[in-house]
Amino acid sequence: MAASKTQGAVARMQEDRDGSCSTVGGVGYGDSKDCILEPLSLPESPGGTTTLEGSPSVPCIFCEEHFPVAEQDKLLKHMIIEHKIVIADVKLVADFQRYILYWRKRFTEQPITDFCSVIRINSTAPFEEQENYFLLCDVLPEDRILREELQKQRLREILEQQQQERNDTNFHGVCMFCNEEFLGNRSVILNHMAREHAFNIGLPDNIVNCNEFLCTLQKKLDNLQCLYCEKTFRDKNTLKDHMRKKQHRKINPKNREYDRFYVINYLELGKSWEEVQLEDDRELLDHQEDDWSDWEEHPASAVCLFCEKQAETIEKLYVHMEDAHEFDLLKIKSELGLNFYQQVKLVNFIRRQVHQCRCYGCHVKFKSKADLRTHMEETKHTSLLPDRKTWDQLEYYFPTYENDTLLCTLSDSESDLTAQEQNENVPIISEDTSKLYALKQSSILNQLLL
């Protein structure tokens, strides 16, 4: 049964030795020493996984060859070429070093055929050209138990590391957005970034190896790389505007690079967090008959400052406010020279006044928003902004509505202004020619020319 299940994995491992190219997993090679055995992956250091002390390398199962722990693929290549043994699903082995050491000992106690499925290559060729390959996989109960025990051991190490971080009060970190320093527990800086910068990477109790996680994110920002789409930008301001406008101030849950920092990915052998969560939902979905196949997520819409009108793009919203309410936010921004933070204050100020049914032009309070809107349209008070000191206050840094999409689309980029508008703001200082004649008469050049 084991041989029939896995025969395809190595069936094309070697062809006739008449000079033809051999293949492993569909990849061809001419020289068996230079073959690529399987899709390669860069070495990873799973959080919390420790190696045996005094053993920085991993030995071959059969001989005395040793390879560094980080060069796992070279060892696999050596074993399949020199010893004709293939280990199935290596990526599901939680601790590769302990796994190899275990089987190295077992193969000295019993023949390899007691543990491995034997697959004969070129069975139709002459007997002297046939070769046997050995497949070690979890079909063997002993191998399955070993893999599960290694997984449990890694989970215990991860939970111990997590508990240590939860109890650690000597944490020191710097916010990657405002450079504020934090001392004490890791939860302080994580809660700060979630609360003050809307950057939520998860609950502190769900994260492990927090220092390494934060260093990984900080390195991306230092390289001017977006944390979500991982595009690189020319400067920090461009990156900041991109992450704010595109709402990319978050990490991509589909990026496997971050999986090792979440405890959920260590819970079950060979299962990602998505598969674990899907299993939890299946019990609920089994009792539901609703068809969600035609459900589509609608993009977040920006809401008008004065009425309930919503628009899918900010450009349409600007046109609506100008046509329906004679309020031109872009013109106000240009005339008053508002930067991003001042625009935020102004929008939050107007939102609060409209919410309180108060006209900010004449300070009259109305019974309903409809009455306020009628009054402001008739008196044209929508464009009658109060003095800057009225709305340019610290209290208006805080949004009136938590889901105000309009705030995410504001920009202080100079590219929003036309070339003419930019030139109008540049002062031109004329040259002082009042003393030009006297300067000419006293010049030393006159003496040289005489």
Swiss-Prot record:
PROSITE patterns with a match to the protein in the record: ZINC_FINGER_C2H2_1, ZINC_FINGER_C2H2_2
SUPFAM superfamilies given in the database record: beta-beta-alpha zinc fingers
Alphabetically ordered keywords of this record: Acetylation, DNA-binding, Metal-binding, Nucleus, Repeat, Transcription, Transcription regulation, Zinc, Zinc-finger
A biological process term (GO) from this entry: regulation of cellular senescence
Superkingdom of origin: Eukaryota
Annotated compartments: Nucleus
Consequence recorded when altering I332L: In a breast cancer sample; somatic mutation
Family affiliation: Belongs to the ZNF277 family.
Role played: Probable transcription factor. Involved in modulation of cellular senescence; represses transcription of the tumor suppressor gene INK4A/ARF, perhaps acting via the Polycomb group (PcG) complex PRC1.
Stated name of the protein: Zinc finger protein 277
Taxonomic lineage from the root: Eukaryota, Metazoa, Chordata, Craniata, Vertebrata
